From Swiss-Prot:
Gene Ontology CC annotation, any one: nucleus
Cofactor(s), by name: Mg(2+); Mn(2+)
Keyword Nucleotide-binding attached: yes
Catalytic activity: ITP + H2O = IMP + diphosphate + H(+); dITP + H2O = dIMP + diphosphate + H(+); XTP + H2O = XMP + diphosphate + H(+)
Known partners and oligomeric status: Homodimer.
Designated name of the protein: Inosine triphosphate pyrophosphatase
Organism: Phaeosphaeria nodorum (strain SN15 / ATCC MYA-4574 / FGSC 10173) (Glume blotch fungus)
Gene Ontology MF term list: dITP diphosphatase activity; ITP diphosphatase activity; metal ion binding; nucleoside triphosphate diphosphatase activity; nucleotide binding; XTP diphosphatase activity
Amino acid sequence: MSPTPAHLNFITGNKNKLAEVQAILAGVIELRNENIDLVEIQGSVEDVTTDKARRAAEAIKGPVLVEDTCLCFKAMNDLPGPYIKWFMQSLGAAQMHKLLAGFDDKSAQAVCTFAYCEGPGHEPVLFQGRTDGKLVESRGPTAFGWDSCFEYKGQTYAEMDKSEKNKISHRGKALEKLKEWLAQKVDA
């Protein structure tokens, strides 16, 4: 097993995502940010994230952390899934709930997949978190993606305190797995 890196280059141009990941990983590992425009393949979230990690590691020539997020609607056989970004750009959070207007089932699953890649030529390691909820009309601040229309136990992500959200969110769950993995590398 390779040693734990001194820092990780988190590849994202999303300042809200960066702040959330920094908050969750605070005190665990130094997180640096790189905003690289990566080609994003179409496929499963695992395939997309793995490919992004390989491309980013090649570009950075060192250890990277990348992330891909899905929002899956049971009534639509898990669509939009990894393509949620494009739905959000077209509809926005205020209109997202209309996608399920013709369905009784409003259940949704938020899925976050991180990939760590040690560097060029190394196989990425995946860490995935999932949170079950439902799609609702937008409530709360709309500054962070679909947080205002994804409800977990009566509150949208946007209505939650950030530290509370980070404990139960798909991203928080995935990063807990990453933290456990990093701790095992230190202990090895």
